[in-house]
Amino acid sequence: MKGLENLGLENIGQVFHNLSYDELLKHEKNNNEGVCTKNGTFSVDTGIFTGRSPKDKYFVKQDPSQKYIAWGKINQAISEELFEKLLVKAKKQLSNSDIYIQDAYCGASLKSRKAVRFVTQIAWQAHFVKNMFIRPKEEELSGFKPDFVVYNACKCVNEDYEKDGLNSEVFVIFNIEKNIAVIGGTWYGGEMKKGIFSMMNYWLPLENKLPMHCSANVGEKGDVALFFGLSGTGKTTLSTDPKRRLIGDDEHGWDDEGVFNFEGGCYAKCINLDPQSEPEIYGAIKQNALLENVVLKDDLSVDFNNGSKTENTRVSYPIEHILNHEPSLSAGHPSNIIFLSADAFGVLPPVSKLSKEQAMYYFLSGYTAKVAGTERGITEPVATFSACFGEVFLPLHPTVYAKLLGEKISKHNVNVYLVNTGWSGGAYGVGKRMSIKATRACINAILDGSIQNCEFENYDLFNLAVPKELAGVESKLLNPINTWEDKKAYEETKLKLAKMFIENFKRYEDVKEGAEFKLAGPAI
């Protein structure tokens, strides 16, 4: 293959370059990398790491990128010297062996996409890359020039990590100036997916384009909707709609031409997967898909309800496995943006219409609430705030992304809504989870535009515009005060959540945008 000498590897055995799905399956079987399930889907275990290792992620601190990066717990700095040392170690691991090289694009927009080359010793990791990124056409492969190279030396660990001042023997390092990432010590496939997402979150804003952690779909009339939300808020479920084509389920960009998927596949959670409630995802698990960390029954079928290896069981598959997908992986500018929050305190309305300033506030807040682990006997919900609904993937300051979103909302006259997929009638333990039927009715009213004709009332403290009536939703559900029996507990809980929002937003007080958008939040 062309460009092999540029990789800096020595005494390479065979190079398996851009293998087909059938070839990859053959290698996976021959290498004993996993098991073929009853229906022909290959299944692998990712070892001790069944999720990402955010504490082991670093950026090389150097010019010019160091002046743009928001350094801290999320974006940790590493020296050029230490990067070079670990890169040499990783290259040594990848040398003197057979290697798999997979070339792919990140970004469906020809103007915005990046060409990425992945180098690994493991066939299933090449398979994962083939599923998750955009597969180049035959003619594109012949002249493929990578913008970025990922060395995945998952078999290699850094025994000197304590001496080096690092968190563990695992390392995931990005050198922006050299256009290289190096991974060591973890086999988890999601490091490659989210690693390149982090890089897109660095590159695109510098070109005045917005990278987003959201799902997207498009209606028959070409109207585009974006769904932002943290894990467990219903992003994948609600954007998978038989009446609308799926653009993508997780990572998108928004440039002057519209919205485009970064990926060519989906990475869905499998735990408790039910063919009745999520038939599209269930149907996508077939040959060419790749299962991770699932438990198999004696007949080699998947036990989706078994989380004994991890709750984070996953499947990656090419987006073509979803019948109702948008083949171009792109569409025009959004008509509607929906922020999903699973509010376990039970005080956010099922649906609220946001002003542009409120959109900035709730985007920067990135709120959801998780239900605490029952093993400690705790029934109190835990508030989670993750800027832009994906803070762990943002190399730049969150206000950079918020500012870009605000400009695009104004320019394209986009409607923005906050939808609570969490609790109603009381907090977790007292109230009930919002039914999917009621949430779908709220989403449908947003997408068909009928919510625009509603009469709205002000939801005090949060100052949110809430519809008085909405087709398909019981009217008393629309304002949380009507659903709580204990009005005193309601007022106390509402105030408590408002204070949490205010406390979290103090982190933005040192920047101009923070002081400006703060006024759109709860007012005590």
Curated annotation (Swiss-Prot):
Question: At which positions is ATP bound?
Answer: K194, H213, G229, L230, S231, G232, T233, G234, K235, T236, T237, E278, R314, T439
Q: Which cofactor does it need?
A: Mn(2+)
Major enzyme class: lyase
Sorted alphabetically, the Gene Ontology BP terms of this entry are: gluconeogenesis
EC numbers listed for it are 4.1.1.49
InterPro entries in the record, alphabetically? PEP_carboxykinase_ATP (IPR001272), PEP_carboxykinase_C (IPR013035), PEP_carboxykinase_N (IPR008210), PEPCK_ATP_CS (IPR015994)
Cofactor binding notes: Binds 1 Mn(2+) ion per subunit.
Task: Could you list this entry's UniProt keywords, alphabetically sorted.
Answer: ATP-binding, Cytoplasm, Decarboxylase, Gluconeogenesis, Lyase, Manganese, Metal-binding, Nucleotide-binding
Residues that bind substrate? R52, Y188, K194, R314
Question: What's a GO cellular component annotated to this UniProt protein?
Answer: cytosol
Sequence positions that bind Mn(2+) = K194, H213, D250
Known pathway: Carbohydrate biosynthesis; gluconeogenesis
The answer to whether UniProt assigns keyword Lyase to this entry is: yes
Instruction: Write down the chemical reaction(s) this protein catalyses.
Output: oxaloacetate + ATP = phosphoenolpyruvate + ADP + CO2
Its job: Involved in the gluconeogenesis. Catalyzes the conversion of oxaloacetate (OAA) to phosphoenolpyruvate (PEP) through direct phosphoryl transfer between the nucleoside triphosphate and OAA.
Concerning its family, UniProt says:
Belongs to the phosphoenolpyruvate carboxykinase (ATP) family.
User: Which NCBIfam families did the record assign?
Assistant: pckA, PRK09344.1-1, PRK09344.1-2, PRK09344.1-3
- This protein is called Phosphoenolpyruvate carboxykinase (ATP)
Organism, scientific name = Campylobacter lari (strain RM2100 / D67 / ATCC BAA-1060)
